[in-house]
Amino acid sequence: MNLWGFISAAVLLTLMPGPDILFVITQSITRGRKAGMVFAAGLCTGLIAHVTAVSLGVSILLMSSPVAFTMLKFAGAAYLLYLGVKAFLARRENHFELSGDAAVSGKLYRKGILMNILNPKVILFFLAFFPQFIDKGIENPIPQMLLLGLVFMVQAFLIFSMVAAVADRLARRLMQNPKV
């Protein structure tokens, strides 16, 4: 198992522009760092579905059924479109910190889970790229898959948390600037 190669690929994938990182930035700018981190926790929880699917061989079944895979891609695209339209039409609000509102936190967390599960970039990574890092010829690859899945979740949460903190800090600086 090439752990450092996997970590490098995982970090690059996580930093690559896409809906997950864009929504972490959006939540952090509009609602604060805490909201971005709650959303990031949801995204990382959604990764459990991908790791489980790969570990149990469900991904092989999905890839062998073009209809099922296409339906999943369309569901993901439709959900991302829905979120984009909803964000575009949303009333512009001033920057505020998520103040322990459990309903808002729960909604952001659930949105993160669903968004990650339906994200085509993450699906393709776990279907096509992830298995390349599993040692060939081992009798039971499941523990190795679970370990790599855990590593992926941890690095993703760390990166999303840093992105949330930076986006929040930039938003606060811009809001304090009288010229903005």
Protein language model regions, located:
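Juxtamembrane transmembrane-helix termini in multi-pass membrane transport proteins
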Residues: 1-70, 128-148
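Flexible cytoplasmic inter-helical loops of multi-pass small-molecule transporters
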Residues: 89-105
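Multi-pass membrane proteins that catalyze or facilitate reactions on polyprenyl-/lipid-phosphate substrates
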Residues: 88, 127-140, 162-169
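Anionic-ligand binding region
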Residues: 101-114, 119
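Selective transmembrane alpha-helices of multi-pass membrane proteins
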Residues: 64-92, 156-163, 171-180
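Alpha-helical transmembrane segments and their lipid-water interface positions
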Residues: 46-58, 80-86, 115, 123, ...
